[in-house]
Amino acid sequence: MPPRLAAALALACATLILGACGFSPLYAQPGVTSGLADIQVAAPRGRVGYLVGEALDDALATRPGAPAWRLDLDLSEQRFPRGLRVDNVATRYEYVLTAAYTLRDTATDAPAKVGRVRVELTYDSADQPYASVAAQQDAQERAAAEAARRIQLELAAWFAQQDAP
C-alpha cells in the first residue's frame, strides 16, 4: 500500500473514532466564542498587569460595546535566586506569577467564576546590568502570556459547561 494512501486511511479512521466517542473541539460549543468576546478585562496597574491584560484582550477577541462580563485580576510576582556562584551571586532566577481572577456578571456584579493560575519559569541573570534587566522583562512577558493562555482556557471550559445540556 502506498504511504500516502496509508496516511489518508489512518487519518480517516482517527476522525471516525474521535467522532464516535463524542469528541468535539472546545470552541465548537455554542456560546464559547461569543461568551469570551463579551468579557471586559480589568487588569491591575503595573507592567505585568498591562502585559496580562493585553494578552487577555488579544486572546478573548473582545468586541466593542457593553460587555456582559468583567474579569477582575489580582496578580502577585515572586522572584527566587537559584544557581549561586562561589561568590554567592545568583546566576539564575525562578520567576513565579500568580493570577487570581474573578469573572463577574456586569449586570449584578455577582461572581460567576473564581480561579487562580500559577506560572513558574526560570531565566539567566547576566553580569551586565542591562542584560539582567532584559532577561527579567522577558521572563515577565513569557509568564504573562502563559497566564493569559491558561485563564482563557479555564474560561472557555467554563462557558462550554454553561451551555452543555
What does each model-identified segment do?
Residues 134-165:
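C-terminal/domain-edge helix-coil "capping" segments
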Residues 22-25:
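Bacterial signal peptide processing site
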Residues 1-10:
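Bacterial N-terminal signal peptides that target proteins for export
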Residues 16-20:
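C-terminal motif of bacterial Sec signal peptides marking the signal peptidase cleavage site
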Residues 33-43, 128-131:
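Acidic/histidine-rich, surface-exposed loop or edge segments in extracytoplasmic proteins
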